[in-house]
């Protein structure tokens, strides 16, 4: 696909930076170092090692871009990352450079972040519970991600989605896939890769406010914010946000987590537990994976002198505040296909504390048996075992 786009570049000189050249279709091209003639006009090829960790990847990518930009021979640079690399890592290279006023910010900007999606397999992929290792795609022994998790993340965090092999599926399937992409990432433009002229034109088009970095607001985040830019719900498709102020009972919620959630393709948001009332947890789910993480303390449990003081933060906090619970709340956005959202939300509602349980007070809540606490401790122990420090 990149070959086709490059063919439409006109007289511009492009550089191509590959994440891993060893298994690439251009592996047989001769050349040494960070510069190589691939096409008749003399593009550039540089290679990044696939095995590097996220920090090393960012450092290697920054160094490679600085090297190529320093040649001052090219008008544009295309970076092709491994499918195992999270798109947010590539974006962070430029966003951090802008925020920290690093040299890279003065030499290059990120115009587009493109995710290439295989139209013939993406529907099966977002519904898959297969671990990456089962597909021969694992990034290492510690890579426990599943296919649906990686695929959804890459779709959510891009500015353009190139739909490859769209001609391989019928019209109804193609429309369903495009609808899925627009639910997951309503801000991204969906391009049919078969139209290489249009694809090249869009990739060449500068992104608005590119000098300010790139940000993402996936469909789940827009749902929580009340943004109406997502496609309308239909008989098959459903979207909604489960909202509540009361805390979850840890054991009832754990049992709910362990049950099947048929039809739910994406669920993400934040929640709190009666047994850990100061902690804010994130919830992240695809059709093939479901996990939670402690991400910090609620502001009501944080000394006020430590709060940010900007007006936008204070306005938002005020809109979320209740007298009884402060900013603590349940907000879980769901996107489903063939999902019974009403039944699912009713199940979640039954996991909230009852009025009698609320009257027991926080001291009693903290003594509730809590499977989430045990799971958090076990996860922390595993991280300590793999920490090189």
Question: Predicted segments — roles?
Answer:
Residues 23, 122, 131-324, 330, ...:
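C-terminal accessory "lid"/substrate-recognition subdomains
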Residues 58, 88-91, 171-175, 254, ...:
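Conserved strand-to-helix beginnings and helix N-cap segments that scaffold or border functional pockets
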């Amino acid at each position: 696909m990149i070959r086709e786009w490059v063919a439409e570049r006109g007289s511009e000189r492009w550089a191509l930076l590959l994440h891993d050249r060893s298994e690439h279709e251009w592996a047989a091209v001769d050349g040494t170092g960070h510069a190589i003639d691939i096409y008749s006009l003399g593009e550039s090829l540089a290679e990044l090692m696939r095995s590097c960790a996220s920090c090393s990847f960012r450092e290697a990518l920054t160094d490679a871009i600085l090297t190529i930009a320093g040649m001052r021979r090219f008008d544009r640079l295309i970076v092709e990352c491994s499918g195992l690399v999270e798109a947010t890592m590539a974006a962070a290279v430029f966003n951090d450079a802008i925020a920290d006023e690093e040299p890279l910010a003065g030499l290059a900007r990120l115009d587009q972040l493109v995710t290439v999606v295989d139209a013939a397999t993406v529907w099966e992929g977002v519904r898959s519970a297969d671990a990456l290792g089962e597909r021969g795609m694992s990034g290492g022994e510690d890579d426990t991600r599943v296919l649906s998790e990686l695929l959804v993340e890459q779709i959510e965090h891009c500015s353009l989605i190139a739909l490859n092999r769209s001609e391989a599926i019928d019209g109804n399937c193609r429309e369903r896939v495009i609808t899925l992409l627009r639910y997951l990432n309503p801000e991204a433009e969906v391009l049919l890769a078969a139209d290489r002229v249009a694809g090249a034109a869009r990739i060449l088009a500068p992104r608005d406010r590119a000098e300010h970095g790139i940000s993402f607001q996936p469909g789940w985040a827009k749902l929580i914010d009340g943004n109406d830019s997502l496609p309308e719900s239909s008989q098959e498709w459903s979207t909604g946000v489960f909202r509540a102020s009361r805390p979850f009972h840890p054991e009832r919620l754990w049992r709910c987590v362990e049950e099947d959630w048929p039809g739910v393709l994406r669920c993400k948001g934040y929640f709190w537990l009666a047994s850990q009332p100061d902690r804010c947890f994130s919830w992240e789910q695809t059709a093939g994976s479901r996990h939670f993480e402690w991400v910090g303390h609620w502001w009501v449990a944080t000394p006020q002198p430590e709060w940010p003081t900007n007006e936008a933060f204070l306005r938002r906090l005020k809109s979320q505040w209740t007298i009884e619970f402060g900013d603590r709340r349940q907000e879980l956005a769901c996107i489903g296909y063939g999902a019974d959202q009403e039944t699912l939300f009713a199940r979640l509602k039954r996991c909230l504390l009852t009025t009698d349980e609320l009257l027991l007070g926080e001291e009693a809540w903290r003594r509730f048996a809590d499977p989430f606490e045990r799971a958090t401790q076990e996860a922390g122990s595993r991280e300590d075992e793999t920490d090189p420090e």
